[in-house]
Amino acid sequence: MATVNTDATDKDISKFKVTFTLVVSGIECITGILGSGFITAIYGAEWARGKTLPTGDRIMLMLSFSRLSLQIWMMLENIFSLLFRIVYNQNSVYILFKVITVFLNHSNLWFAAWLKVFYCLRIANFNHPLFFLMKRKIIVLMPWLLRLSVLVSLSFSFPLSRDVFNVYVNSSIPIPSSNSTEKKYFSETNMVNLVFFYNMGIFVPLIMFILAATLLILSLKRHTLHMGSNATGSRDPSMKAHIGAIKATSYFLILYIFNAIALFLSMSNIFDTYSSWNILCKIIMAAYPAGHSVQLILGNPGLRRAWKRFQHQVPLYLKGQTL
């Protein structure tokens, strides 16, 4: 069995590193929580009023809610892993944090992938019968596909609770030139199982993203050739929609690839708990959901207008409270 072992003692704690990690990742998480919470509140309020949400808005609600959960969970894990080490390094608590983190990451990726597939089918233009069939059926199938995505994410994250992570503590490590002892925390990771379940959980949605981006690029190329030398080509709404969707997909893929690498390295325990590389992984992991939540708001005209109204109303509300 291929395993990776790391250890850390109480002396490894650096107050500067702990403070720096908590502040930077905390700012990122709070930014993401505000963004995801805003999206959830907008679409959740419409759903609570009994309105039937369009398919795209329904996916956005699921994505923003799962992302809100992920960011809150990441903040909790950072606090526990850095400030409450005794509790965090209990085997059951450690495994619980890792499994739920992977589950929420996989769910987020699936929901984001379905969102891109949905907009690809709306924007791209092909004459193939299969494309027309998918375009007609996607609205009916989407609720079931979202539920299936949750089950698939669970099926590739729950096995991580068995025979992958193991944490134990030795409280009797002697300190040289001293009669006292110190605690030493040992983490063991089964790399074979981690690589299999982690990669299988992200493989299909990443392929969906790449296919959606490829179809959008091909559709844009066909549309550009069709427009020819039309002087209004650069202002054509279809071309703008294509370019906007391609930019959004590219932005997400860049963010997610960095996040996937950072999450895997963090899960594998390759780096020491308080090493600079491990801190960098935590910061990258917090940046991905925050960055994509901001991009979703900026890239959606309805959410952009709602955010501007929110910014205008908050000072008025605060002013009224002080009177």
UniProtKB/Swiss-Prot annotation:
InterPro entries: TAS2R (IPR007960). The chain crosses the membrane at residues 15-35, 59-79, 101-121, 141-162, 191-211, 248-268, 277-297. Residues 36-58, 122-140, 212-247, 298-323 are cytoplasmic. It comes from the Eukaryota. Residues 1-14, 80-100, 163-190, 269-276 are extracellular. It is a multi-pass membrane protein. Pfam families: TAS2R (PF05296). It is found in: Membrane. Gustducin-coupled receptor implicated in the perception of bitter compounds in the oral cavity and the gastrointestinal tract. Signals through PLCB2 and the calcium-regulated cation channel TRPM5. GO terms for cellular component: membrane; plasma membrane. One of its GO terms (biological process) is detection of chemical stimulus involved in sensory perception of bitter taste. Glycans are attached at N170, N179. This is Taste receptor type 2 member 40. Belongs to the G-protein coupled receptor T2R family.
